[in-house]
Amino acid sequence: MAKKMPDIGEYKYGFHDKDVSIFRSERGLTKEIVEEISRMKEEPQWMLDFRLKSLEHFYNMPMPQWGGDLNSLNFDEITYYVKPSERSERSWDEVPEEIKQTFDKLGIPEAEQKYLAGVSAQYESEVVYHNMKEDLEAQGIVFKDTDSALKENEDIFREHWAKVIPPTDNKFAALNSAVWSGGSFIYVPKGVKVETPLQAYFRINSENMGQFERTLIIVDEEASVHYVEGCTAPVYTTNSLHSAVVEIIVKKGGYCRYTTIQNWANNVYNLVTKRTVCEENATMEWIDGNIGSKLTMKYPACILKGEGARGMTLSIALAGKGQHQDAGAKMIHLAPNTSSTIVSKSISKQGGKVTYRGIVHFGRKAEGARSNIECDTLIMDNKSTSDTIPYNEILNDNISLEHEAKVSKVSEEQLFYLMSRGISEEEATEMIVMGFIEPFTKELPMEYAVEMNRLIKFEMEGSIG
């Protein structure tokens, strides 16, 4: 018997709690609000100057004229800063009760106890809970919310801040630079390998809320780390904005994997800038899952600056009714013998739209560089659409570039075979979809793979007929 298609109100993470914030800025973006954010955070003068300069860039830069439809995004209707509690806690018991109940519903304390080396939980504009295992601290690993790192690790913080993504990069990077709050700061010392993942969880609770976390990760020579972030928000009738910036520096021989499982509600604009600089023989892997949001525009980038540097992006995007996933990757080869891989898996259903948008650049010094791109799309019905928009720029003849794109529908032969074995059409379709995304889920830690499969199954309910 076919399952009932879930109503939007049944979205598991769509609950919202009463407002328990201790401060909320006026709606709209002004110099006074930026100054107020900086004053409340007791920031050094250089950070206030950085914010105000970024605000000027934001005002002066045009909106993107490509990608998704941003016409319904009204910057004057957004609340840019909501402070949910007095401070970030290291004991779960000390987190304010209403906020703790939200994260309890999302399974955060349980996840930490089971398999995480460290956890950070951000609610609205601030990190409300942060903890890391003591043995990692003893190795010199720094894992803090970004605001604390600015105060406690200012020298290394300032050395790398906004060096990978300056405020002039794009309008939303400028916006983030002006009003950023929260996020994660990670430093892994030379030769130290973090064996279990560090996680951050980002939650929007308020209506018309903007969340602008800023994450900075520095992986020193021959060090390694795996960082995982998850995102959810309540279902509202008005729009919210998530506009993060993620900067990563991977030094000689270092390794970083950054895993995202984004499950924002369908009223959230998810407009994110993520970029890594990889030095000699460094490796960066983006594992990027996009299930929710009204519109996602996200293209994780690797600047392969050192000889032998490697970059990989493995992404999945699922778009249903009223959704547009405009996602992809950028690989910038600047040195000899660099290599990159892009694997993009997209599913569109019930009139959803998926777009792969990618750039691969081979600079003049990229002798012997190589890149492989695979784009696979599964279209579930005649109402849904898919576009593939690759852009390749080649300034060196001695390179290798392979690009394969494939668009398919659920095969009648596959369905017939499975249904002839007593499997319902809905279950058969679900099995085909699970097989399609398996290259992505097998790269996730086990607990995340289970959750990802559950999310996909939930999204696929009601897709038949």
UniProtKB/Swiss-Prot annotation:
InterPro entries: Fe-S_cluster_assembly_SufBD, SUF_FeS_clus_asmbl_SufB, SUF_FeS_clus_asmbl_SufBD_core, SUF_FeS_clus_asmbl_SufBD_sf, SufBD_N. SUPFAM superfamilies: Stabilizer of iron transporter SufD (SSF101960). This is Iron-sulfur cluster assembly protein SufB. Belongs to the iron-sulfur cluster assembly SufBD family. It comes from the Bacteria. NCBIfam families: sufB. The SufBCD complex acts synergistically with SufE to stimulate the cysteine desulfurase activity of SufS. The SufBCD complex contributes to the assembly or repair of oxygen-labile iron-sulfur clusters under oxidative stress. May facilitate iron uptake from extracellular iron chelators under iron limitation. Pfam families: SUFBD_core (PF01458), SufBD_N (PF19295). One of its GO terms (biological process) is iron-sulfur cluster assembly.
